[in-house]
């Protein structure tokens, strides 16, 4: 699983423009996206892990680490801003520490136990910078320095901050600000001369000097090919040069054996490829590379190791040794001057032995652990890793199987014991596994120690626990934003004299030149300790409608016009003026989010019945209703007694235990309302006035009948008994002359035999209107008194029918608030009557509001609220009819 870490320069110099019109930071962001697209072509890229680190101060520089997903990585990449310093050293250290978080916990480094090339986390660090001077809080640095103090436990066990499976590459942007003639030459991109180049070469990478967009694309394609699984090893020649071989394959004695000048192939810092197993996807190996020290059981600590092992090779030709069933590891070398030199010799049947200095028991002795050999086809050079001091072990094992037939004698055992003593103890475990594979599992006893002291083992365990804690802490801190700066500190230098105007200038000059002892300069320039310049907050936008001083001078006239239109609402726009600007000030990352904007837009088509709740699509029957959507306000409306499940039970309709059907919420049983016609003129103006009728609606206590039942017959489910004709829509109204409730017995036609007919009758009286009424209008007045029910519909007085126009302004808002209050659960109806008192307009408007509230209360079965609203409606009717009765008396 390769790790691809992008280290992006976020210093202020990355804001410079190129000839393309984009900034360096924009080019860096685009380069990351292009690299990811190129990398996605490889099927092996499925296991890639991407990380993002910037030049911000730690720990805020880590934008995407071990736990962040691809979406977080892309979001943080798009939100990068260039506003800091070029702290390349600290950023590199933070990147290496991030990669080394889990190494002690997982045991990849295997300190003191040999270096296993097949234990690796291949990582590629790609730095994109402008190559300018390195700056930090104290000044400008000429050289690149990485901090030595690392918060990561166990960092002292390695001399360098990086590891042998981590390589650093740098894309140094040198794009000019003005377009130049296309004079670039085809070929490899040259390395840059900045300070990061040397650091790249130390880790096994390189830098690229990018001058055009075409060169950048070429570099990215090259980097994609560099993502390989392997470790970096430093190969060095030891001993004399090999004899020169002529064209005929024989040694040429005329040429000297040793060259006095160093050749490029004498020292190479290159990668060896560690191929993963095609079946498991994980590299498999058997033998480690030797440590550069002999592990001593009496040593309390481990000496620090170098990141890249120094493997020395001898140029003495030897024949490769191998026996049957003995495992060995084979690693291909990256093309280098060393591989080129070996292949040019054209000797695929000869090898050069490799070893590590100070790996033996005695510091001056080093035994080979493998050899370098060209492939048979002379296409590559391979490193074969064998058991330690394999020239001694392989003949012993060959005799064991071929001569002794797995029954060694005393002499063979003594030779084998001497070999084990000269071998580093960390080779015992892999050797025992190899012997078990070969069929000799009992040659090495189980009580042999690995070679590390108890103090070293306990120290490594303690480091592993500390590394786990530090890893969790760093993972939690990833993504945190740095605290905003309160301001810029300002020093007052206006009252201070220049050094050239000081009286002791000559003495200061002599101190600098060394003529007299240097005297410290008084640097107290009367600094204001608490004086700061406030920083501009980019997130805060000027509120032109709140503070007139935020309006630029050139926009004053335009702003006054917009404020006037916003105040007077001269336009028909639904968007207010202060919201109009914010719609066009959206971040680039949110411009494509159309779904959230569409959710706030009103529906282009109105609902068939806006008062009905939305149907919930349930599994199975699409007409099935969700019972949770039924709101029952009154506790006494529930059927408290035991339900009778027998069929054909026809009990008393008014009994509390009788079962009734629930009212269907389906809009199929109701007739759709005709939308009102929007007009700009006002109808219904009369002598009643508009303001004189306020404050007359009050909640009135519920009247009780003689038998304790509520006025008007009610069923067990709380629904009111509705008549079948239009005159009997509201059977619960109070007689206008006597003030007594109408008895239930006088209304035989009000009680329908079925609950569903009652519901339909109630809905018809609320929704249906007579054909004599004005088209697209509603009848607002309730049915007349008992004496008026015999009057024909054609002879109805003019004031019995009221035509209502659509509500505008405050009344429209009041209607919405009244509906919301009616729908709220509970028995406190004071808020409803308080809102009805605020209705402005004639009596017809107040009737309309009360009728609408009664209709909504009937949907939610609020019987008590309906009766109180009916009582309030009767009071309005009485007060309206009182002047007419007085006029009749005077006319007599």
UniProtKB/Swiss-Prot annotation:
Q: Where is this motif: Inhibitory loop?
A: 630-637
Q: Which organism is it from?
A: Danio rerio (Zebrafish)
In the record, what lineage is assigned to the organism producing the protein? Eukaryota, Metazoa, Chordata, Craniata, Vertebrata
UniProt domain VWFA: residue ranges: 3-227
Q: Where is this region: Disordered?
A: 665-692, 711-754, 771-793
Q: What protein am I looking at?
A: Integrator complex subunit 6
PANTHER family assigned to the protein according to its UniProt record, in alphabetical order:
DEAD/H BOX POLYPEPTIDE 26/DICE1-RELATED, INTEGRATOR COMPLEX SUBUNIT 6-LIKE
**Gene name tied to this protein:** ints6l
Which positions carry the signal peptide feature in this UniProt record?
A: none
User: What SUPFAM superfamilies does the record tag this protein with?
Assistant: vWA-like
The written remark on domains in the entry is: The inhibitory loop acts as a regulator of protein phosphatase 2A (PP2A) activity: Asp-633 and Glu-634 residues mimic phosphoserine and phosphothreonine residues and bind to the PP2A catalytic subunit PPP2CA active site to block substrate-binding.
Per the entry, what this protein does is: Component of the integrator complex, a multiprotein complex that terminates RNA polymerase II (Pol II) transcription in the promoter-proximal region of genes.
The processes (GO biological process) annotated in the record are: protein localization to chromatin; RNA polymerase II transcription initiation surveillance; snRNA 3'-end processing
Q: What are the UniProt keywords, alphabetically?
A: Chromosome, Nucleus
């Amino acid at each position: 699983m390769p790790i691809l870490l992008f280290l992006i320069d976020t210093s202020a110099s990355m804001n410079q423009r190129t000839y393309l019109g984009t900034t360096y930071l924009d080019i860096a962001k685009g380069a990351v996206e292009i690299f990811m697209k190129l990398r996605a072509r490889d099927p092996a890229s499925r296991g890639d892990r991407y990380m993002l680190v910037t030049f911000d101060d730690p720990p805020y520089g880590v934008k995407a680490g071990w736990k962040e997903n691809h979406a977080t990585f892309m979001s943080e990449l798009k939100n990068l801003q260039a506003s800091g310093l070029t702290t390349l050293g600290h950023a590199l250290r933070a990147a290496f520490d991030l990669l080394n978080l889990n190494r002690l916990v997982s045991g990849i480094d295997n300190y003191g136990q040999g270096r296993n090339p097949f234990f690796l986390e291949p990582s590629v660090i790609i730095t994109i910078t402008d190559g300018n001077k390195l700056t930090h809080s104290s000044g400008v640095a000429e050289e690149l320095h990485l901090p030595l103090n690392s918060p990561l436990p166990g960092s002292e066990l390695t001399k360098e901050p990086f590891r042998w499976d981590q390589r650093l590459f740098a894309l140094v942007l040198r794009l000019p600000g003005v377009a130049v003639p296309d004079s670039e030459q085809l070929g490899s991109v040259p390395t840059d001369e900045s300070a990061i180049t040397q650091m790249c070469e130390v880790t096994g990478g390189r830098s690229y000097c990018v001058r055009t967009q075409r060169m950048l694309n070429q570099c990215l394609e090259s980097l994609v090919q560099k993502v390989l699984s392997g470790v970096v090893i430093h190969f060095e020649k030891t001993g004399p040069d090999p004899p020169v071989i002529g064209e005929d394959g024989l040694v040429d004695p005329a040429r000297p054996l040793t060259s006095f000048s160093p050749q490029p192939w004498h020292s190479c810092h290159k990668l060896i490829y560690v191929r993963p197993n095609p079946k498991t996807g994980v590299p498999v190996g058997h033998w480690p590379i030797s440590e550069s020290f002999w592990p001593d059981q009496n040593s309390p600590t481990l000496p620090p190791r170098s990141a890249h092992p120094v493997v020395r090779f001898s140029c003495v030709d030897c024949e490769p040794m191998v026996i049957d069933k003995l495992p060995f590891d084979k690693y291909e070398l990256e093309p280098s001057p060393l591989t080129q030199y070996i292949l040019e010799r054209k000797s695929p049947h000869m090898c050069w032995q490799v070893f590590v200095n100070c790996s033996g028991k005695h510091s001056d002795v080093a035994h080979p652990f493998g050899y370098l050999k060209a492939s048979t086809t002379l296409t590559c050079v391979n490193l074969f890793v064998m058991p330690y001091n394999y020239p001694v072990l392989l003949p012993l094992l060959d005799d064991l199987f071929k001569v002794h037939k797995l029954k060694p004698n005393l002499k063979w055992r003594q030779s084998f014991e001497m070999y084990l003593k000269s071998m580093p103890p960390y080779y015992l475990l892999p050797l025992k596994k190899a012997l078990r594979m070969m069929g000799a599992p009992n040659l090495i006893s189980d009580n042999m120690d690995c070679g590390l002291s108890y103090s070293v083992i306990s120290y490594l365990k303690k480091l592993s626990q500390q590394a786990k804690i530090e890893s969790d802490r760093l993972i939690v801190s990833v993504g945190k934003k740095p605290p905003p700066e309160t301001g810029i500190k300002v020093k007052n230098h206006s009252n201070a004299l220049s050094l050239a105007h000081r009286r002791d200038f000559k003495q200061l000059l002599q101190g600098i030149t060394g003529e007299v002892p240097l005297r410290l300069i008084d640097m107290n320039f009367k600094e204001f300790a608490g004086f700061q310049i406030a920083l501009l907050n980019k997130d805060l936008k000027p509120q032109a409608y709140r503070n007139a001083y935020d309006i630029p001078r050139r926009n004053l006239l335009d702003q006054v016009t917009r404020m006037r239109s916003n105040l007077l609402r001269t336009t028909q726009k639904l968007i207010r003026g202060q919201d109009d600007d914010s719609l066009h000030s959206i971040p680039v990352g949110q411009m494509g989010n159309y779904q959230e904007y569409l959710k706030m837009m009103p529906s282009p088509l109105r609902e068939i019945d806006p008062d009905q709740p939305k149907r919930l699509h349930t599994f199975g029957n699409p007409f099935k209703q969700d019972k949770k959507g039924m709101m029952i306000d009154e506790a006494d409306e529930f059927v408290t007694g035991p339900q009778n499940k027998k069929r054909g039970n026809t009990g008393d309709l008014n009994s509390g235990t009788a079962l009734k059907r629930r009212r269907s919420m389906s809009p199929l049983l109701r007739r759709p309302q005709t939308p009102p016609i929007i007009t700009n003129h006002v109808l219904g103006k009369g002598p009643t006035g508009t303001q004189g009728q306020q404050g007359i609606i009050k909640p009135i206590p519920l009247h009780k009948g003689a038998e304790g039942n509520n006025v008007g017959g009610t069923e067990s489910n709380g629904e009111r008994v509705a008549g079948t004709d239009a005159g009997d829509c509201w059977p619960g109204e109070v007689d206008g002359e006597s003030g007594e409730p109408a008895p239930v017995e006088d209304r035989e036609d009000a009680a329908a035999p079925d609950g569903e007919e009652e519901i339909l009758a109630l809905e018809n009286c609320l929704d249906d209107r007579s054909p004599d009424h004005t088209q697209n209008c509603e009848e607002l007045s309730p049915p007349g008194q008992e004496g008026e029910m015999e009057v024909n519909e054609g002879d109805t007085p003019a004031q019995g029918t009221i035509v209502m126009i659509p509500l505008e302004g405050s009344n429209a808002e009041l209607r919405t608030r009244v509906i919301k209050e009616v729908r709220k659960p509970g028995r406190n109806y004071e808020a409803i009557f308080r809102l009805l008192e605020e209705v402005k307009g004639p009596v017809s408007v107040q009737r309309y509001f009360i009728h609408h509230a009664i209709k909504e209360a009937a949907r939610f079965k609020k019987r008590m609220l309906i009766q109180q609203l009916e009582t309030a409606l009767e009071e309005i009717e009485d007060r309206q009819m009182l002047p007419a009765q007085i006029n009749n008396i005077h006319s007599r």
